[in-house]
Structures are given as C-alpha cells and as structure tokens.
Amino acid sequence: MPRLFTAIEIPESIRRKIACLDLPAADVARITAPEDLHITLHFIGEVSVSLCDAAQVRLRSVITPAFEQKLRSAGVFANRGRPEILWVGVDPSAELLTLRDAIGDVLTSLEIKLDTREFNPHVTVARLKRPAPSVAAEFKQRNSPWYSGFTARSFSLYSVAPGGQDPHYRVVEEYSLRAL
C-alpha cells in the first residue's frame, strides 16, 4: 500500500541556498537530502492502490493560480520539550492556504481522513538523532534571520520510498498551477 502526501517541491535555486545553512554535523543530525526538500500540504498516509489512483485523478481538478512563496527564518520543532526537527519557516500566505484547502476538499471527498492539527508550513532540513537543545538553539541563532522565496508553479502527489532509499520521496504526479 502506498504511503502518500501532497507537497510543493522546493526549486533547485532555493535548495542551494538551504544547503548553505549552518547545519549540525552528520553524527548529530540526519540532514534532509536536497532532492527531498518540500513543503508538505497534506499527509495522507497509507492507502490502497485504488484510492491512490482515485486521488491522483481527482487532484487534477484543483485549479488555483501560481503564487509567490516566501521562506523565512530557521526554527525547531520539539517533542515533549526535546528538539527533534530543524526547519526553515514558510510564510502561510493566503495563496498557500487556498491551495491547501482546495487539495483538502478533494481528499476529504474521497473519504481520506486529514490531520486536524494546526497547519505550520515549513521545510524540514534536518532531524536530530538524539535530543540536543544546544544544537537546536545554535541552529536557530546561526541561521536567523534567513529569507528567500520562489514562485510556486505546481504541487505534487508524493509516495514515500520503502526501506529508507534515497531520495525518500517519489513524485506520483505533478499538478500545474495557473500561470501568474
């Protein structure tokens, strides 16, 4: 059964900028491969092949315009107070939220249950291998302020590669947004 999510791919020019961030050493953090950098819109999870096929087709009905997407500052997600995820923030623009809502409407029409937690758009750049508050604080301090941006011209339905292969994510289908 495929494990799916929808996301906006990060363009190569922005990947290069993210690669220049002051990231922790490999013994402390697992750095996200550049080709895996993305902004998750909806995590779908494991679904049947038939539901994957239906989602792939129905997502073609999402029609929203391309938009300018801003990235801003570095941050950390913690679990029970322990830092785990290092990220670059994504401006929750009206256009991004409109796209996310349109995708969500399609997915819920297929009876796919979506995450109900507050949407906090970001690009995961690394995962700490063990809790390291000083490493997380240093990451934020060394990489803030940080700003960039790009034109979001499409979104994709992704599947997660089995067994930790690189890249970890495979585009099932890419969906173009309307030209600006």
Give the ranges of each region predicted by the language model.
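Histidine-dependent nucleotide/RNA phosphoesterase domain, centered on the 2H-phosphoesterase fold
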Residues: 1-180
